[in-house]
Amino acid sequence: MSCSGGNCGCGSSCSCGSGCGGCRMLTDLGEERSSTSQTMIMGVAPQKGHFEELETAAGSDNGCKCGSNCTCDPCNCK
């Protein structure tokens, strides 16, 4: 997920935006990766693309709060 280009910016109303690159929503994906090999079995349903997810989440400002140094705390824009 992301908001406004992947950044939670600290704007005047402490909303999602690109005011400053406080926290990137896509960094959470790195935690799901591991160094071991994994096998994925895909079903018959088409895989949802990342662009669709970005479009769905773009422009949303729920749950984005400003912390110190113009960072988001927590960075959980929905």
From Swiss-Prot:
Coiled-coil boundaries: none
Protein keywords:
Metal-binding, Metal-thiolate cluster
Q: Per the record's keyword annotation, is Metal-binding included, yes or no?
A: yes
Q: Which GO terms describe its molecular function?
A: metal ion binding
List, alphabetically, the Pfam families matched.
Answer: Metallothio_2
Biological role:
Metallothioneins have a high content of cysteine residues that bind various heavy metals.
Which protein is depicted? Metallothionein-like protein type 2
